[in-house]
Amino acid sequence: MRRANRDYGKYLRGSEEMGSCPGVPHEGPLHPAPSAPAPAPPPAASRFMFLALLGLGLGQVVCSIALFLYFRAQMDPNRISEDSTRCFYRILRLRENTGLQDSTLESEDTEALPDSCRRMKQAFQGAVQRELQHIVGPQRFSGVPAMMEGSWLDVARRGKPEAQPFAHLTINAADIPSGSHKVSLSSWYHDRGWAKISNMTLSNGKLRVNQDGFYYLYANICFRHHETSGSVPADYLQLMVYVVKTSIKIPSSHNLMKGGSTKNWSGNSEFHFYSINVGGFFKLRAGEEISVQVSNPSLLDPDQDATYFGAFKVQDID
């Protein structure tokens, strides 16, 4: 019995030694397999992160300058003048006010600034660049020179959609031609009263298109005469309006719309009035110009709700 127990104990010890032998294969790997590298963030996420940091940097610079001006005014209100404050706001709104102007025209606007405003603009631009370089790092900042080589506020404007082209122009009552012959009206208001223009150009009485597209053009012309103004030029008047398109690339003009009538204003009536309204959709190219011609300009009604014309873009050209 004892001998059997001793033999069984030797058998167990032998099994343990065999299990710890280096030659015996192990179940499972000795070392865990290396994990796969983390996927790189998608380009859209990187671009969003960069734009977020960009906006944060611009906001920090603007807030810093605003705080500086505030505390400077609190310490000595006489040291900061109204001109300095106006200059600061003028710099911030420089690009917004220029609209579609290119870099050459923007440089001319910058040269028109006073020396103090130009120095403030240069300091502000340098502060923006240093702040962006500090946030995104020198290597990544050097990789986006196209953003900084153009306008100094183009970075803030890249995400801003371009303004929809439109114009509403009212006649300049102080510069209406006289006579009864057909003339081109060359003096319009674009920023007075109801007149407004955006993303289009008014030059020498002609409305220039800056974007290709389909536009709705309209014109309203009113003729009037009172007996206190004297006699009319003729018993029968041809009261007409023409909306004309002029191409600059290929010098030519075409009538897009016309309207009017022949009126007899020779009666005993104290007051005569006639209104013409025309409108329509047209495909226009950048650089083309729209103008208005009328007959008997001396009879025009100069009120802003009587004689006007305009245009607005409806859709792009496919």
From Swiss-Prot:
Q: Which keywords does this chain's UniProt record carry?
A: Cell membrane, Cytokine, Developmental protein, Differentiation, Glycoprotein, Membrane, Receptor, Secreted, Signal-anchor, Transmembrane, Transmembrane helix
Give the residue ranges for region: Disordered. 13-41
Q: According to the UniProt entry, which residue ranges have a biased composition of type Pro residues?
A: 31-41
- Offer one example of a GO biological process linked to this entry: positive regulation of osteoclast differentiation
> Which Gene3D superfamilies has this protein been placed in?
2.60.120.40
Cited InterPro entries: TNF_dom, TNF_ligand_10/11, Tumour_necrosis_fac-like_dom
Q: Where are the Cytoplasmic topological domains? A: 1-47
Coiled coil segments of this chain:
none
Q: Which residues lie on this side of the membrane: Extracellular?
A: 69-318
Known glycosylation sites: 199, 264
Q: Name one GO molecular function term.
A: identical protein binding
The THD domain sits at 165-314
Fetch the CDD domains from UniProt: TNF
Give the UniProt tissue specificity note: Highly expressed in thymus and bone tissues.
Kindly list the residues the record flags as site (Cleavage): 140-141
Annotated membrane topology is:
Single-pass type II membrane protein
Q: Which residues cross the membrane?
A: 48-68
**Record-level GO cellular component terms:** extracellular space; plasma membrane
Q: How does the record describe its quaternary structure?
A: Homotrimer. Interacts with TNFRSF11A and TNFRSF11B. Interacts with FBN1 (via N-terminal domain) in a Ca(+2)-dependent manner. Interacts with TNFAIP6 (via both Link and CUB domains).
As for what it does, the entry says: Cytokine that binds to TNFRSF11B/OPG and to TNFRSF11A/RANK. Osteoclast differentiation and activation factor. Augments the ability of dendritic cells to stimulate naive T-cell proliferation. May be an important regulator of interactions between T-cells and dendritic cells and may play a role in the regulation of the T-cell-dependent immune response. May also play an important role in enhanced bone-resorption in humoral hypercalcemia of malignancy.
- Protein's name according to its UniProt entry: Tumor necrosis factor ligand superfamily member 11
Tell me which species this is from.
Rattus norvegicus (Rat)
